[in-house]
Amino acid sequence: MWIGVISLFPEMFRAITEHGVTGRAVKSGLLQIECWNPRDFTHDKHRTVDDRPYGGGPGMLMMVQPLRDAIHAAKQAAGDGAKVIYLSPQGRKLTQAGVTELATNQKLILVAGRYEGIDERVIQTEVDEEWSIGDYVLSGGELPAMTLIDAVSRLVPGVLGDQASAEQDSFTDGLLDHPHYTRPELLDGLAVPEALTSGNHEVIRRWRLKQSLGRTWQRRPELINNLALTDEQESLLAEYVREVRDSVK
């Protein structure tokens, strides 16, 4: 997968190109990340990339020309088929379903804004989609861009050593992940659930599904309400709810 990034701080992306899962993906050639800095497309000695907004108000906006030229350079490097995404709190909220959708693209260009944002005409003429990672304000689009890259790259075949890791992550099936345990089997009086040490794969599968359903019901009930549960899921969730209510009587 190829990802181009437009950012005034391209050095920030070393965090994902040199470390962790994404760093290994870059080193193995499964993921390619290239950055373009709008400052490299300025024509004045101060390398100016911001200007005052029309109509007044606080803050500055990223200038059209350097930003647009940087996007054009990224498009030229990408070739045909690259989707341009602007990271913005006004965009579509990123969910696992959205990550899966974005992962179907072989080429993405991510535009990380700064200051008070970018000129609306750049969005109208250069951007295909706007995406947000949440209803809060950050200093720039770099962290959202890195979040998107990390999430999407996990779905690229071969990036994870075990593809089941991606398939079992929280939200992949609309549910939160189940609890996980490793050695020792007994820690400060707390034991690993018997189901996980039973060696029975079906018992383990049902326990994990039940815990996933229950945890989602307790922590993110709106996710449960949006799902069409199978008969097995409904039965396991009812069992979980009953056990919780019995425990507080």
Curated annotation (Swiss-Prot):
CDD domains: TrmD-like. S-adenosyl-L-methionine binds at residues 113, 133-138. GO terms for molecular function: tRNA (guanine(37)-N1)-methyltransferase activity. It is an enzyme of class 2 (transferase). It comes from the Bacteria. Coiled coil: none annotated. GO terms for cellular component: cytosol. Keywords: Cytoplasm, Methyltransferase, S-adenosyl-L-methionine, Transferase, tRNA processing. GO terms for biological process: tRNA N1-guanine methylation. It is found in: Cytoplasm. InterPro entries: Alpha/beta_knot_MTases (IPR029028), tRNA_m1G_MeTrfase_C_sf (IPR023148), tRNA_m1G_MeTrfase_TrmD (IPR002649), tRNA_m1G_MTases_N (IPR029026), tRNA_MeTrfase_TRMD/TRM10 (IPR016009). Gene3D superfamilies: 3.40.1280.10, tRNA(m1g37)methyltransferase, domain 2 (1.10.1270.20). It catalyses: guanosine(37) in tRNA + S-adenosyl-L-methionine = N(1)-methylguanosine(37) in tRNA + S-adenosyl-L-homocysteine + H(+). Its EC number is 2.1.1.228. Belongs to the RNA methyltransferase TrmD family. Specifically methylates guanosine-37 in various tRNAs. Homodimer. This is tRNA (guanine-N(1)-)-methyltransferase. The lineage of its organism: Bacteria, Pseudomonadati, Pseudomonadota, Gammaproteobacteria, Aeromonadales.
